[in-house]
Amino acid sequence: MKRGEIVENPGYHVREIPKGVIGESSKILEEVLELQDAEDQNALIMALVELSDMVGAIELYLEHRHPTVTIEDLLIMSHITQRAFKNGRRT
């Protein structure tokens, strides 16, 4: 993915990052782009904050798009996927 243009008078982020819509995948993408910008700046704490913001954006996406699914449900599936990759098999 192409990184945004460098902004003239930066705040936290030195690249232009389009604003997403709360509850939509565009907000998750915004947080990913902010994470990448933090990494480009070698800003460890900022990167961790962006990861936290990403979790929040995912929770709001679920509330908006899949109200019966929780972040815990996603974590269960994530752990199962990790197990499958670790063991080298999907069946």
Regions from the language model: what does each represent?
Residues M1-T91:
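Flexible "arm" and connector segments at domain edges
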